[in-house]
């Protein structure tokens, strides 16, 4: 059986490297089932080893991913709703709130900055 540090490393790999955060239905419970541990243990691992809550960590990963998509030429015609869904958010308003929390700007503002940079080139 894994100790908390080992489980934290495994969890980070599962979430970040495998991009399971992009699944809208991904939750603490689904992660717990995948690992064969209780949801309460998942929460304690996040608090003790990662230093944040499960949901804050997952939503930050979703926010980072959304920002990458917003800056990508491939996704420049995608709607903000599409970007939100592709990043694992259930709707664009949740992405909007998290983007403000993490970056201090909204996804719409981010998109305008990217478009202005493209025009200058």
Task: Enumerate the language-model features and the residues they cover.
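N-terminal positioning helix adjacent to the helix-turn-helix/winged-helix DNA-binding module
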Residues: 3-11, 27, 50, 59-65
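Terminal helix-turn-helix DNA-binding modules in bacterial transcription factors
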Residues: 49-53, 57-86, 113-121
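Sequence-specific DNA-binding recognition helix
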Residues: 73-111
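Append "Primarily bacterial transcriptional regulators
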Residues: 27-37, 42, 46, 82-89, ...
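Inter-domain helical "communication" segments and dimerization helices
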Residues: 1-23, 41-44, 68, 112-121
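Basic, amphipathic alpha-helical hairpins
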Residues: 12-26, 46, 50, 67-78, ...
């Amino acid at each position: 059986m894994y100790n908390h540090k080992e489980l934290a490393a495994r969890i980070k790999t599962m979430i970040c490297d495998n991009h399971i955060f992009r699944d809208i239905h991904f939750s603490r419970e689904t992660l717990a089932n995948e690992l064969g541990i209780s949801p309460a243990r998942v929460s304690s691992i996040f608090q003790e080893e990662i230093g944040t809550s499960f949901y804050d960590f997952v939503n930050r990963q979703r926010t980072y991913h959304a920002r990458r998509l917003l800056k990508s030429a491939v996704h420049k015609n995608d709607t903000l709703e599409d970007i939100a869904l592709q990043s694992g958010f259930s709707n664009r308003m949740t992405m909007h709130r998290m983007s403000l929390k993490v970056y201090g700007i909204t996804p719409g503002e981010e998109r305008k900055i990217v478009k202005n940079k493209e025009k200058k080139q």
